[in-house]
């Protein structure tokens, strides 16, 4: 790591701490040449490969937005959705891949949403899994009943 002040490559890590969300690491560093201290925040990037082949950085806000519609009229708070998005991101990062398909995001959302609200789960699953008949809904409800 280069010193922000004198541009020397000779720096030493004094302290490292994981952020509260567990996604980034804050490091306190000291330049061995000028002795000044500075902090860095390090995160591993997570890229989403969309269905059309384009890529974009993972954003929790998109998870919240996608799940919000399924939760309308349900007893689900914004804080609940924020926690769900954090868990989804943690699950995706735990896979060890720096790139994930948009399909993987949907698969990571389903169990978290099921834990949060069964009706919202059915709503989200009906769109995500492209339900096109009453039988699709019935099978999904039966699976929930049998759990």
Swiss-Prot record:
GO biological process: negative regulation of DNA-templated transcription
Zinc finger (unnamed): 3-34
Cofactor: Zn(2+)
Domain named ATP-cone: residues: 46-136
Pfam families the record matches: ATP-cone (PF03477), Zn_ribbon_NrdR (PF22811)
InterPro entries: ATP-cone_dom, NrdR-like_N, RNR_NrdR-like
Cofactor binding notes: Binds 1 zinc ion.
GO-annotated molecular function: ATP binding; DNA binding; zinc ion binding
Keyword list, A-Z: ATP-binding, DNA-binding, Metal-binding, Nucleotide-binding, Repressor, Transcription, Transcription regulation, Zinc, Zinc-finger
Function: Negatively regulates transcription of bacterial ribonucleotide reductase nrd genes and operons by binding to NrdR-boxes.
Protein family per UniProt: Belongs to the NrdR family.
HAMAP family per UniProt: NrdR
NCBIfam families for this protein: transcriptional regulator NrdR
Protein name, entry field: Transcriptional repressor NrdR
Protein source organism: Tropheryma whipplei (strain Twist) (Whipple's bacillus)
């Amino acid at each position: 790591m280069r010193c922000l002040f004198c541009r020397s490559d000779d720096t030493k890590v004094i302290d490292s701490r994981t952020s509260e969300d567990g996604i980034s690491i804050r490091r306190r560093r000291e330049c061995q040449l000028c002795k000044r201290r500075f902090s860095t925040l390090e995160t591993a990037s997570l890229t989403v490969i969309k269905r059309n082949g384009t890529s974009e950085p993972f954003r929790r806000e998109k998870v919240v937005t996608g799940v919000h519609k399924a939760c309308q009229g349900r007893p689900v708070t914004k804080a609940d959705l924020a926690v769900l998005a954090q868990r989804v991101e943690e699950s995706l990062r735990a896979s060890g891949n720096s790139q994930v398909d948009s399909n993987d995001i949907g698969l990571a959302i389903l169990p978290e949403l099921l834990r949060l609200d069964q009706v919202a789960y059915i709503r989200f699953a009906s769109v995500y899994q492209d339900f096109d008949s009453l039988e699709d809904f019935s099978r999904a409800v039966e699976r929930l009943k049998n759990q």
